[in-house]
C-alpha cells in the first residue's frame, strides 16, 4: 500500500514554521521540491543569513502546511524535522530538484542575485525537511 505524502507535491508553496528559542513560531512561505531519491524529504532554499536557518540550527522541530504565495495556509499543518544541508551531494540534489520544479523562476532568482553582485550558490542555504510520522 502506497502512503500519501504529507504535503501534496502539486502545491507550489509550503508554509514553513520554525521555532525561536523561546518557543514562539515564525512562519514563512517557501518553494519546495521532493528529493528524487527520498520523496518524503522536501528541499527548500533560502538566504544563508535567514532567520529560519539559524532557528533550524538550534532546533529541528518545524511544521509544514500548504499555502499560497502570501503564506495564507489552505490545509492542515504537519509536524516535521528540518536541518540545514552541509553535504555537497545533498546540496546538489536539492538544487537540481528545485531548478527542475521551478524552471524559469529558478533561473530568474539566480539572475537577480548575480545582478546584486552575489554568487547565488555561495549566498544560499539548503534546508531539508521531513514530515514526522503521525503517532
What do these predicted ranges mean?
Residues 1-5, 24-26, 38-45, 86-92:
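A broad, low-specificity signal for short, low-complexity segments enriched in glycine/proline
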Residues 49-114, 123-128:
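Short, structured beta-strand-loop surface elements
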Residues 1-15:
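Short, basic/aromatic recognition patches
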Residues 11-48, 54-56, 62-66, 75-79:
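Short beta-strand segments
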Residues 1-3, 127-132:
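Short, small/hydrophobic-residue-rich motifs at membrane-helix boundaries and re-entrant hairpins
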Residues 116-118:
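Short proline/glycine-enriched turn/loop segments at secondary-structure junctions
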